[in-house]
Regions:
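Generic structural motif
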Residues: 28, 104-105, 185, 203
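Short helix-loop boundary/capping segments
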Residues: 183-218
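Bacterial Sec-dependent N-terminal signal peptides
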Residues: 1-43
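Active-site-proximal loop/helix of nucleotide/amide-processing enzymes and allied scaffolds
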Residues: 37-175, 217-288
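N-terminal, charge-rich interaction modules
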Residues: 177-180
Length: 288
């Protein structure tokens, strides 16, 4: 897993002295879990956490790329931007990514944004050209796997002030994990919750689906005019571990935008905290 080393002048102590409850989730019930019902952590918890970190990092990077691509597009909109039908990310190697904006007929590229992930440099090109065969395949694949969501029932709705962002991870040949997680333009807020994912093939056949949180968990970064010293929320059997979406959302909305360098998830199943430390990019298990 490739890790970007972040630098920060913020607090480095992950053992936070005070926490702010981010959701009224029957807090007393969280701590009244019968110890006899708590499960032991899996023997492969280290490997589980590594996979969570890796997927969380990829979700974060995909969202950052999307933000950059859209910012460049809106700052340099082509004259025929009304004919834009959508855009797709195209990765050429581990260092360079392009955002391809195509027309409604899905025949031509109207605008391109290029990003160097190592340097952060961006460039744009408004030269109209034909879509390549590979680009057409990418558009078709994304439409198919994202459209597969229509076959699922009882999905959470995006709360007011938020919308769903969709990110796709390729797990192996012809198997994709499609993440739906919240995004928001609201300031001083991390939009945890209402997220889910499913695994499907290139034809949109869903193999497995999972919900991470059933409800919206807005984590405020400012309370009573001051930055909060810590944030946490609880997970039940629905999702007993910290999630890739938790990690991605904290990196996007919390880390670097507040003094916070981490957050915690309390697992009612295992009776412990999973603490994500962004500076060291690791998950630390803290027993009560």
């Amino acid at each position: 897993m490739k890790i970007i080393i972040f630098t920060s002048s913020f607090l480095n102590d992950y053992m936070m002295k005070r926490f702010v409850v981010t959701l009224a989730l029957c807090a007393l019930a969280i701590f009244s879990v019968d110890a006899k019902k708590e499960k032991k952590l899996p023997k492969d918890i280290g490997a589980i956490n590594e996979r969570i970190l890796e997927e969380g990092y990829h979700l974060y990077m995909q969202e950052k790329v999307a933000w950059i691509v859209e910012d460049v597009f809106f700052a340099n909109q082509p004259e025929d931007s009304d004919n834009i039908g959508g855009w797709v990310p195209v990765t050429h190697d581990g260092q360079n990514v392009q955002g391809i904006f195509f027309n409604k007929e899905k025949t031509k590229v109207l605008f391109e944004v290029s990003i160097n992930l190592e340097t952060g440099e961006t460039s744009s090109n408004a030269t109209v050209r034909e879509l390549t065969e590979d680009e057409l395949k990418e558009i078709s694949l994304r439409e198919t796997v994202i459209g597969a969501v229509k076959t699922l029932d009882d999905l959470p709705a995006a709360p007011e002030g938020c919308s769903f962002n969709v990110n796709i991870l390729k797990l192996e040949d012809d198997l994709y994990r499609v993440y739906w997680m919240l995004g928001t333009a609201q300031h001083n807020l991390i939009p945890f919750g209402c997220d889910f994912s499913y695994d499907c093939d290139s034809k949109g056949n869903i193999k497995e689906s999972r919900k991470y949180h059933n409800s919206y968990i807005p984590a405020m970064l400012i309370m009573d005019g001051s930055p909060v010293e810590g944030i946490w929320h609880s997970h039940t059997q629905l999702s007993p571990f910290i999630t890739p979406t938790d990690i991605a959302l904290f990196l996007l909305y919390g880390y670097g935008n507040s003094p916070l360098t981490g957050f915690r998830v309390y697992s009612t199943v295992y009776g412990c905290y999973f603490h994500f430390d962004a500076n060291s990019f690791q998950i630390i298990i803290i027993k009560e």
